[in-house]
């Protein structure tokens, strides 16, 4: 069995969270320690917490801190990319993922959609 899976969609609102719920349910019946990870979230603002992270942490009662479930915000990622530091962004995401991989038996990753973001 693999030790991680990355769920992504071809567009926003494609059902990633529903797939994530089903996979997390299955994984918890098969694997002792499962982590949830999103590489990039919209905001770190307490009032605007990521709804997928909140849902997964609460529904499956994961023993994880919220701050351990993501690598950076959209704003941080955009700043790194526009300043020519894409490699730093990739390194930051990879380091956060590897920390989870070292602590958990399986890491379920859910991609991010930026349907409401200006990507031009």
Regions found by a protein language model. Give the residues of each.
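Generic structural motif recognizing short loop/turn segments at the entrances and edges of beta-strands
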Residues: 1-3, 105
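N-terminal phosphate/diphosphate-binding loop that engages ATP/GTP or pyrophosphate donors
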Residues: 3-14, 18-99
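Phosphate/Mg2+-binding loops and adjacent switch elements
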Residues: 88-120
């Amino acid at each position: 069995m693999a030790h991680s899976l990355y769920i992504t969609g071809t567009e926003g609102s494609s059902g990633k969270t529903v797939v994530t719920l089903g996979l997390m349910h299955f994984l918890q019946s098969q694997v002792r320690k499962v982590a949830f990870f999103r590489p990039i979230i919209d905001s770190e603002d307490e009032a605007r917490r990521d709804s997928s992270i909140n849902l997964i942490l609460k529904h499956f009662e994961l023993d994880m801190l919220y701050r351990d479930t993501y690598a950076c915000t959209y704003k941080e990622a955009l700043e790194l990319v526009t300043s020519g530091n894409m490699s730093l962004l990739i390194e930051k995401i990879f380091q956060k993922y590897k920390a989870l991989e070292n602590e958990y038996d399986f890491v379920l990753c859910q991609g991010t959609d930026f349907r409401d973001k200006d990507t031009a």
